[in-house]
């Protein structure tokens, strides 16, 4: 459910649910009520995410990015393989080369934790069929 809901949010799709919400378990409820992910989906800019061409650990790792109305960037990494894998992308791919003196402060929405991109490269290891979604803010390096 997490991967499915995450891609819907990034693509700006309607967030509909096809289960009896009175009887859903806590894990499902936590996914469907993730306020950070809903905020990305409902962003006022109404832009859809675009697929990026990253330096992948394999063709089963996919990355999407979506510009948000306040200048943040929503980033989704999706491991579509049956093996643990690492995704790597350079800030150049998001239009933020190191020469600008800026980097990204990445706040993960599953779970909520913040870290900063160093040396212009972000590496994220994901379990099989897992995903990571970030709300990234441009900050001084």
Language model features with spans:
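Hydrophobic, well-ordered secondary-structure elements that form the walls
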Residues: 75, 106, 129
